[in-house]
Amino acid sequence: MATELEKALSNVIEVYHNYSGIKGNHHALYRDDFRKMVTTECPQFVQNKNTESLFKELDVNSDNAINFEEFLVLVIRVGVAAHKDSHKE
């Protein structure tokens, strides 16, 4: 039986594949699908951010796509922000 952390990691992978698979390449999240993903899946995180500049920051190899490793940087950023919010009173 999967642990809570294993379930959470599976969900992260599933979200990535749901959007990266739109264009048929499960290893690349393209600009328009990235925009759709962040505005749908983490709207509070991106409400005051430019998705284009965020895409460029994450695309460290400059191939105009976000691979899974680059996507995990976004997951970390959102996780850190959510953790901070969880401690606000």
Curated annotation (Swiss-Prot):
Cellular component terms (Gene Ontology): calprotectin complex; cytoplasm; cytosol; extracellular space; intermediate filament cytoskeleton; plasma membrane; S100A8 complex
Q: Which UniProt keywords apply?
A: Acetylation, Antimicrobial, Antioxidant, Apoptosis, Autophagy, Calcium, Cell membrane, Chemotaxis, Cytoplasm, Cytoskeleton, Immunity, Inflammatory response, Innate immunity, Membrane, Metal-binding, Repeat, S-nitrosylation, Secreted, Zinc
Q: Name one GO biological process term.
A: autocrine signaling
Q: Which residues form the EF-hand domain?
A: 13-48, 46-81
Binding of Zn(2+) occurs at: H17, H27, H83
Give the location in the cell: Secreted; Cytoplasm; Cytoplasm, Cytoskeleton; Cell membrane
Cited InterPro entries:
EF-hand-dom_pair, EF_Hand_1_Ca_BS, EF_hand_dom, S100/CaBP7/8-like_CS, S100_Ca-bd_sub
Question: PROSITE patterns attached here?
Answer: EF_HAND_1 (PS00018), EF_HAND_2 (PS50222), S100_CABP (PS00303)
Molecular function GO labels: antioxidant activity; calcium ion binding; calcium-dependent protein binding
Per the record, residues carrying S-nitrosocysteine are C42
Which sites bind Ca(2+) 1?
Answer: D33
Location of N-acetylalanine modifications: A2
User: Quaternary structure per UniProt?
Assistant: Homodimer. Preferentially exists as a heterodimer or heterotetramer with S100A9 known as calprotectin (S100A8/A9). S100A8 interacts with AGER, ATP2A2 and with the heterodimeric complex formed by TLR4 and LY96. Calprotectin (S100A8/9) interacts with CEACAM3 and tubulin filaments in a calcium-dependent manner. Heterotetrameric calprotectin (S100A8/A9) interacts with ANXA6 and associates with tubulin filaments in activated monocytes. S100A8 and calprotectin (S100A8/9) interact with NCF2/P67PHOX, RAC1 and RAC2. Calprotectin (S100A8/9) interacts with CYBA and CYBB.
Could you identify this protein by its name?
A: Protein S100-A8
Q: Which organism is it from?
A: Rattus norvegicus
Protein's gene: S100a8
